[in-house]
Amino acid sequence: MIGAALQIGLAFNLICSGTLRSGPVGLALPEQDGESFTITYRIDVDGRRWCSDACDDVEPLDSILEGQIVLRDQHDPDGSNVVTIFPAMRRFTDTTIDGNVATLRSGTCDPEPFTGFPLNTA
């Protein structure tokens, strides 16, 4: 279903579960040392918008390329945050670097019907 969304332009939710791990930039962060979490992404491919969990902020979708949906690709002098969905593999990654601390979230995603964006967001 996720792959079909890329081809025909759909909106859908993704319920993603995985492991969160944090530590100094440059050191290995083994999955077995991480903590479990679940996040819900709401993605509107046609409208090129997305949000997560309570949808406090609806953001523009960064790009769709080579079988990937890049939700966010932000870089500044203090760090970066890149959130990528790999539809064919039903996987996602969310990597944040804040100063000298890296936080990695990764796991699997299951598609659900699109629940829309809150009315109070653009």
Region spans (language model):
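Beta-sheet ligand-binding and adhesion/scaffold domains
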Residues: 72-122
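Extracellular/mature segments of secreted proteins
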Residues: 23-28, 55-65, 116-122
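Short, solvent-exposed loop/hinge segments that bridge or flank secondary-structure elements
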Residues: 15-49, 77-87, 104
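Amphipathic/hydrophobic helical signal segments and adjacent flexible N-terminal regions
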Residues: 1-15, 21-24, 112-122
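Contiguous, well-ordered beta-strand patches that form the walls/edges
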Residues: 49-84
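Short, intrinsically disordered, charge-biased short linear motifs at domain edges
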Residues: 2-5, 36-43, 89-99
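Disulfide-rich extracellular modules and peptides
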Residues: 18, 53, 57, 111-112
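Classical cleavable N-terminal Sec signal peptides
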Residues: 2-11, 30, 40-45, 71, ...
